[in-house]
């Protein structure tokens, strides 16, 4: 890669030659990942056909209990996002085991970082990248979970997010997913459209079969939708688990895991 990657209203510099991207297959190199193709996920893909998934953290391990991903997969959940890190101080002790167990049982897996915008973004991205470089790596792109402003202005928040996304890309060679909720994107982040070419994972517990439209921040479509935080899942001892929909078919989800791009569905 010899030139920067244009994403939204700012440009990611090319990942260094030594980045972890070089250990990935050619399908996940930055040149391929950086060409998102918008896709209308509804009504082309009926709600019932959108793959279900979960996201978990240490809370889903009460008293150190393991997650039985074989049962999770049989219950109809095709993917999981596992919390890896938070700020510069926390690493999820269950991350590696969860990542390996999920992929060993046919569940697509990605890691997420919970942002602490009161501390350095680049340092957080570096720690996050180090943690998620487990054996085999993650099948889904990395995720930035941004949901606390901690007194920062919209401009300061957006700068923080840019820095984190750039450093994560430098370290991993994959364009991150952005997770947040509607009011945070609209209010704390000023409804910025700077990040619209990054995949959106939106939290919206509206009880419907689609997130509230129009989406915040100028996004034309969503990639993942967290629609509940209170689901009981076979194989997980915790009472409540976050559940999600992927905005496409299972075939598109597998392709997204390989490329970071949601391709248009064939009619």
State where each predicted segment sits.
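Surface-exposed beta-strand edges and their flanking turn/coil or helix-capping segments
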Residues: 67-69, 95, 124, 157, ...
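Flexible, glycine-rich phosphate/dinucleotide-binding loops
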Residues: 89, 118, 185, 209, ...
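Substrate-binding cleft of extracellular glycoside hydrolase catalytic domains
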Residues: 38-171
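Catalytic domains of cell-wall/extracellular-matrix polysaccharide-remodeling enzymes
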Residues: 140-215
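Functionally critical loop-and-helix segments that line ligand-binding/catalytic clefts
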Residues: 10-58, 194-267
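Short secondary-structure transition/capping segments
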Residues: 127-136, 155-165, 184-193, 218-235
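Solvent-exposed, flexible loop/coil residues
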Residues: 63, 71, 99, 118, ...
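Secretory targeting and sorting signals
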Residues: 1-9
């Amino acid at each position: 890669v010899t030139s920067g990657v244009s994403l939204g209203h700012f440009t990611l510099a090319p990942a260094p030659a030594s980045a972890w991207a070089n250990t990935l297959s050619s399908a996940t190199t930055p040149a391929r990942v950086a060409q998102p193709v918008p896709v209308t996920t509804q009504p082309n893909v009926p709600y019932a056909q959108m793959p279900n998934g979960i996201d978990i953290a240490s809370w889903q391990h009460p008293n150190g209990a393991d997650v039985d991903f074989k049962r999770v997969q049989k219950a109809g959940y095709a993917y999981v996002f596992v919390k890896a890190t938070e700020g510069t101080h926390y690493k999820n002790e269950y991350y590696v085991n969860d990542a390996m167990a999920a992929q060993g049982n046919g569940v697509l897996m990605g890691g997420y970082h919970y942002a602490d915008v009161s501390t350095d973004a680049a340092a957080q991205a570096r720690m996050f990248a180090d943690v998620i470089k487990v054996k085999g790596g993650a099948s889904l792109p990395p995720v930035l979970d941004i949901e606390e402003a901690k007194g920062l202005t919209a401009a300061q928040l957006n700068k923080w997010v840019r820095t984190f996304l750039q450093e994560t890309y430098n370290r991993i060679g994959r364009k991150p997913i952005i997770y947040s909720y509607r009011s945070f994107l609209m209010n704390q982040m000023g409804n910025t459209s700077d990040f619209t070419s990054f995949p959106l994972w939106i939290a919206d517990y509206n009880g419907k079969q689609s997130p509230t439209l129009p989406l915040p921040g100028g996004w034309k479509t969503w990639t993942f939708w967290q629609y509940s935080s209170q689901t009981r899942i076979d194989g997980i001892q915790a009472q409540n688990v976050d559940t999600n929909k992927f905005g496409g078919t299972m075939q598109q989800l597998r392709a997204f895991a390989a490329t970071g791009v949601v391709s248009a569905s064939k009619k």
